[in-house]
Amino acid sequence: MEKRRMNLPTGPDTLCFDKDEFMKEDFDVDHFVSDCRKRVQLEELRDDLELYYKLLKTAMVELINKDYADFVNLSTNLVGMDRALNQLSVPLGQLREEVLSLRSSVSEGILAVDERMSKQEDIRKKKMSVLRLIQVIRSVEKIEKILNSQSSKDVSSQEASSPLLTGQVLERIATEFNQLQFHAVQSKGMPLLDKVRPRIAGITAMLQQSLEGLLLEGLQTSDVDIVRHCLRTYATIDKTQDAEALVGQVLVKPYVNEVIVEQFVESHPSSLQLMYNKLLEFVPHHCRLLREVTGGAVSSEKGTIVPGYDFLVNSVWPEIVRGLEEKLPSLFNPGDPDAFHQKYTVSMDFVQRFERQCGSQASVKRLRAHPAYHNFSNKWNLPVYFQIRFREVAGSLEAALTDGLEDAPAGSPYCLLASHRTWISLGKCWSDEMFLPLLAHRLWRLTLQILARFSVFVSELSVRPVSNESAKETKKPLTGSKDPSEDQGSHASEASAASISSTQLVYVVSDLGRLQEWLPDLLETVKQKLEMIGFKNFSSISAALEDSQSALSAHVPALSSRIVQDLSESCFSYLKSALEVPRLYRRTNKEVPSTASSYVDSALKPLYQLQSGHGDKVQPAVMQSWLQEALSDSTHRYFETVSDVLNSVKKMEESLKRLKQARRSPATNPVSSSGGGMSDDDKIRLQLALDVEHLGEQIQRMGLQTSDIKSFPALMELVLAARDQAAAEQP
């Protein structure tokens, strides 16, 4: 409860403190004094406190004087209050006794009324039971009377033999029998009902027997009125299922047993289709009358139809499924996947055609919800079929990936057998010979698994050591030089079986490009198949395929790098023969060089072979990029080699000049040819210049620009400067 705030008297404005400080809950004397000392002296604080203390005393006295009369009169007003209260206790006690007595009387009355009402309710229930029993007996007697009168008419008159009259009598009996059943259920447990029950059972048996006979007669004679009266009677007694079961047993089952013959189905591949066609003929030939009466046909008139029946769903279909399961069990065997696929496809087409014979969408829904429909669908062991197909596809693909460097068969757009088999496997998943709509999700997952497996295969190839194909060829040595491959020993023969050639790397890149180029076509095929099952979320399908495509394209840079590296090594393995040029001209008295060395043509041979042999397998831009990068790398190393040779020649020349000056001999320059011709060093410079110029010409013949080859302009500048130096030294 909120505390009541006390109003303190207002002091003069000259006080050095606020009067409300005293009413705060956290008021502290020490804090109050220290706070006031900051403003005034203690003497002034004391004077203000004394002044306010006097004001408080005065206010308290005034408050007491104001309420004094009320304090004095309080005791006076309470005089005699006890006596008045005692006088009230006696009448209140009497009133309490009267109320309790009245309450007891009312409770007794309520109990009496409840007991009487309970007895009346019991009497009413017994009366209702008696009335129901009376109604049961009356209905039994009435039905028996109708039957007896009908029997007497059968003897005395031939009019009763009319099917229409018999149908009307059955409808009257059915109406009364329906009431009989209702009252019998309500009177369950009554002793008298047990005595009447045999008579009820006899009536039931007679009624069902009459209905069955009359319905069969109507169907055999195609009498619409008889069939209509029978079906209406079945509906009246709530026995529509009995009528549907009767039609299934008497009409459908013999026909199904006659049509479904296992020997006939296995005799020819198209026999299953013929069998299904004959089963579908049953509906228009034998169910036309029933469909007209029950409203399942287009020609049915609304005023004459008997609702509540669906003979196609509840009579024809269960018997067809039963016949297929019992007489044709091999139909559902998935051991032979090709035969299983053909049987399943034909069977599902039969189901769709059967659904089209249903009279309405509601009938189709009832058919799909029928237990026999689910049993038929579950009989097809699609998971086992998929596992068999999975082993076929995966086994064939793995066999090809194991022999991954084998060439593709003739006529294939791919270079390698592994790539060819990968594409064949992808196409097979969505081919008409393998695809099933209910397995679309599994086939899509298998598609992604195939692409992922091929990506792993390519990544494994990209880390294999590259076998230098050009190293296996015998290089044409320069005249008077050793075979430059002698220092390599038997390197070419040491290539392991796990290595991969640059040609095969080109095949892999080519196949990757072709596969990525054709993946959109595969996506369109997948979309067409998925539309059959109502799938609409094609964005997720496209995104998943794009991820797989990105994973494949991610291998191209590494493969291209390996190809470029191998080309560069092959090219430079010949270009480094420039180191042999000084040995060919020093102290050999050879003629002045006029043509390039043979190693230049040999160096570019791997590039020519790649361009001419595989130019149609990859895009021109990719091929040009490979050649340009390989030449840039090998030319840079060639530039370093030529620079080293020229520096060595220059150092040798300077060394000989110093030796000549030291000897001061008029002898002939040992580095000069006889007759005062070009020196050996100048011949070396000229030969290197001819080699580099020829290299540039060959590069341009391949469709490349020398300016795009890194280090080639610097190399050309280097050899031209050396040639100019040689020309300047000539007399």
UniProtKB/Swiss-Prot annotation:
The keyword Protein transport applies. It comes from Mus musculus. This is Conserved oligomeric Golgi complex subunit 2. It is a peripheral membrane protein. Keywords: Golgi apparatus, Membrane, Protein transport, Transport. Pfam families: COG2_C (PF12022), COG2_N (PF06148). Its main location: Golgi. The keyword Coiled coil does not apply. GO terms for biological process: glycosylation; Golgi organization; protein transport; retrograde transport, vesicle recycling within Golgi. Residues 469-496, 659-680 are annotated as: Disordered. Transmembrane segments: none annotated. InterPro entries: COG2, COG_complex_COG2_C, COG_su2_N. Coiled coil: none annotated. Belongs to the COG2 family. Component of the conserved oligomeric Golgi complex which is composed of eight different subunits and is required for normal Golgi morphology and localization. It is found in: Golgi apparatus membrane. One of its GO terms (molecular function) is protein-containing complex binding. GO terms for cellular component: Golgi membrane; Golgi stack; Golgi transport complex. Disulfide bonds: none annotated. Required for normal Golgi morphology and function.
